[in-house]
Swiss-Prot record:
It holds the Pfam family OEP. This is Uncharacterized protein HI_1462. InterPro entries: OMF, OMP_efflux, RND_efflux_OM_lipoprot_NodT. GO terms for biological process: transmembrane transport. PROSITE patterns: PROKAR_LIPOPROTEIN. GO terms for molecular function: efflux transmembrane transporter activity; transmembrane transporter activity. GO terms for cellular component: membrane. Belongs to the outer membrane factor (OMF) (TC 1.B.17) family.
Amino acid sequence: MFKMKNITLALLMSGALVGCANIGDSYQASLEDYKQYEEITKQYNVKENWWSLYDDAQLNRVVGQALINNKDLAKAAVAVNRALYSANLVGANLVPAFNGSTSSAAQRRVDISTNSAISHKGSLNVSYTLDLWQRLANTVDAAEWSHKATAEDMESARLSLINSVVTTYYQIAYLNDAISTTNETIKYYTDIGNIMQTRLVQGVADAASVDQAQQAILTARNNKLNFETQRKTAEQTLRNLLNLKPNEALNITFPHIMNVKTAGVNLNVPVSVIANRPDVKAAQFRLSSAFKNAKATQKSWFPEVNLGASLSSTASTVGTALHNPVAAGTVGISLPFLNWNTVKWNVKISEADYETARLNYEQRITTALNNVDTNYFAFTQAQSTLSNLQQTHSYNQRITQYYRNRYNAGVSELREWLVAANTEKSSQLAILNAKYQVLQSENAVYSSMAGYYL
């Protein structure tokens, strides 16, 4: 009776000492906030393998190769497995723990001659902590949520990898076409230079005209060198993504950038369709993990009840070691609130961790919304830029022909023709870049929404 009164008193003291922050309301509000994004996202169909929309079997192969070979993604997979192992380890606390031991000993007196006394001992023990307050269950839940968050981290890495592969693939395609166009420009200026050289010999052109043509050739060659440097950097990026060494061939025949048909973006889908984003899911899961961990830590004020049982035996011979087993049982109660100063600050730390996770979640939501909104804007801008440049290029072609005719008629200087031709060639390169920007921006939309929405 006296012992029961002590246990009751301990429980009352524990309840009086809790005094923990009420984090349940803010956690529930965050869950409701996430639920609204889930409901909006469910209203639309999503195609998560958006790169297949380009109908490019080679691109599909390259993406698949990256998913298999990329080391960052492999490390993310290891992190997921580790989180799973940790969750399983924490879960082991919910089941009884077993251990056993055996030993043998020999004793004899050293002052007289006598035989040794030999004894053999064996024991089997089991212990179990009663989870009266669901503290252990909360700890297990926290570990499981952490594992789910790590799995979403891997999905984020996968999403980023795919986006990088697709954009780099089309960047190299653009640079290949830019180099080819620049080669045509160099030939164009070289032909003009040859004409000027011939006219100089004939005495119908001056040396300045020849120099101007050579100047245009050198400028075009420098542009080509710049494009080649960019292509080498892009190839390095793609090799890193595919985990290919310099001596290993890419084995890729890149398409012409202007022949790539864009998949488009459904701008009627609201920017709030973000629940499919793995980084948003990870932030929400980490919030749940921090909440469960804080609840478990708050319950560390409460008494802990441990049950134990053992079975042991001692004998002088191995054959009779189990003939006289002795059973024992134990009940232990620990009172952690007596160490109130340590428990108090551990609780405060866990609550601060929860608050950090809550702020991280809210920040991630805001970042995701702004990310989608900005990518929508960038896509529409890229489309408009491409359309304007294509129209401008038509005018530039007509202007170049105009000054070429005037020069041939002897009523205009070569410099005017070259300036017009340079503007035309620059706009041609700008169109290639603008087409790449359209592809890049639409892929940024797909990546920021974790798929193509219909």
